[in-house]
Amino acid sequence: LASRYDTAGTARTVTKAAGGQTEITGPYGWKIDQAAETAALMELVSSGSCWSEGQAQADREPVYSQKAASREGMDWGTTYVEVDLGGQHVYMFKEAQIVWDAPCVTGNVSKDYTTPSGIYSLTYKEKDRILRGKKKPDGTYEYESHVDYWMPFNGGIGLHDASWRSK
């Protein structure tokens, strides 16, 4: 089932807001919990509850370890943010329509803080956050920067304001 229905980690072709298509991957998407689903199926079969009046009862949702927004079309749904790394622009879509867009600067490549391409879900949103770089042997950090908002989507990578960056 997982090889047929999982979308997490798979390559997908998307049409960019600025035009053209690109292929993206990432951890976002549907992912069946194979161990739990196997156990659930074994229980259904052994208990006989998968049969009713001689008919197979196949309408059930698998056990997922991760769910996406939609099973139709783009599994991230119609409300999402697109960050165009090449064009250095961010777009906010609501119900498939652009409701906000702005220029942006992505990770500082010269300092090895690149922004990865891919599809991710936001982990949480936070205001007034201090972002810290790697911890140095003396216990201090490579950098400490205050941001007004922070929305991580891939570990220590996320969307935030960056008053110290202009390009």
PLM features per residue range, with description:
Residues W150-W164:
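Glycine-rich, acidic and aromatic/proline-enriched surface loops and short helix-turn segments
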Residues L1-Y120, Y124-S145, Y149, W164-R165:
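Surface-exposed, secretory/extracytoplasmic low-complexity segments enriched in Ser/Thr/Asn/Gly/Pro
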